[in-house]
Amino acid sequence: MTKSLYLTAAEGNVGSVAIVRTVIEELKQRYTNFGVFRAFTNGPIEHDIAFKDALDAAGLLDELDIAWGSTRQAFVADEEESMTELVKRYTDYSHGKDAVLILGFLDGDPLTPGMLPRTGRAAANLSTTVALMLSGALRSGREIEVATRLSAAEMVKEHAPVCVALVSSAMEDLELSKPERYITFTDGEKTYLTDEEKAKLQAAMEKESEVVTPLSFQASLISRARSDRKRIVLPEATDPRILQAADELLTREVADIVLVGDAEQINAHAAELGVDVSKARIVSVDDPELNEKYAVEFARLRQKKGVTLEQARETVKDLSYFGTMMVHMGDADGMVSGAINTTAHTIVPSFQIIKTKPGAALVSSCFLMLMEDRVYVYGDCAVTTNPTPEQLAGIAVSSAETAVAFGVEPRVAMLSYSTGTSGKGPDVDAVVEATARAREMNPDLMIEGPIQYDAAVDEAVAKTKLPNSPVAGKATVFIFPNLNAGNIGYKAVQRSAGAVAVGPVLQGLNKPVNDLSRGALVEDIVNTVAITAIQAQA
């Protein structure tokens, strides 16, 4: 994983030129593949003198065109779009780097209202910690610490942790109550660090942010998928969104893409859209060799259902069946479909062909709920209508495994309208039984149930209702008792809390197949392909 640090001025005239050069000199010696990235530029990048000076110090002037995120003007005009572009460009730039120093506000940049909160949001979305630059000129140690606390508080409000402060023009006899948090520059032209200061900088660089924003999580999906590229088949190549997503996935090297359809038509459609899918493999359902290979295998799999070879030949010409057979036969590592077809049309072939993996009680689904600063897992919100206690236990175990696969520590809450022993009745009994069975299936699983949603997420409520529970108040995986509750629940949180719902992610299959909403955006398709690729890596 790429190490990073967001270095930014907390005020004007902090002597950033000397500080930045000193930090770069140390980091480029410590990391073999080191990068410098400018979050926001002042107008055209070629006019950003401070950034060009930093790149020159790092010996990276040849990266000028790719080592920046957005412009300040674009950010003011449309923060959401600009932030998305920043994260995307940083994700691409940092790919393959050992460490990246991200530069925020520097001397000479306009000090505009909201500078620090904006910087904090950028750092949080880049999933990095912050190093503040301040001036120590004519300031006592206490005054510097007050200024640091005030600036850091602005950052923390935006979920960006500050781990070190670099102070220029500091007095020789400066007294700080917490010197371990500071690197001081008494000489404005200082270009070296003591061993102790190097250790502080190294600790800041190595410290990982625990905050996960929707943008940073989606960026992590891309990075993880890239780390071990998989072949993902997209059988609905007639849809323009699929071709646009394929272009982005191939350009960013997220996955190797297989498109199903007529090559001439697909390439002509791509040309009309202005996208490039030349690196994709294109296969046809009418390919005689593939059709026969898949038909023979499908007939074998379904012979007990009375499927003949002739029937199989026709069945595997269906896009969903063809794509699923590609995955089953090892010609692709996963499939994403549903932009045109219904959920049933997408997933029924996988039930018939790929089937459940060993130990999985059933195929179920979950949503990755991207909250403001963390990720939750909700299941089952899309597949299993009225699960039995045993099936509910299986959903809990599978959802916990999905959580682990996507970097979420699973603490499972088996949701109900009551907590602990406060409620009675068949609905509560079912959750009690499901919780017990889940513990049998995975004795190491942190799980609590029955539990109400507020007791699962609110530590104050948890202390009253379940004071000794390792899950209550800290749950990350939420299992709803049935599809009715689950679907309502995820949509309520999505709409009311502004959460980004990624999914549904199918779980329990031998090989990954995932379904798209028919209203999916290109971004949704890209994310789902990345998720499928990560599942295929397991």
PLM feature spans:
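Flexible phosphate-sensing "switch/lid" loops adjacent to ATP/NTP-binding sites
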Residues: M1-L215
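Anion-binding alpha/beta catalytic cores of soluble intermediary-metabolism enzymes, centered on
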Residues: V211-A472, V477-A538
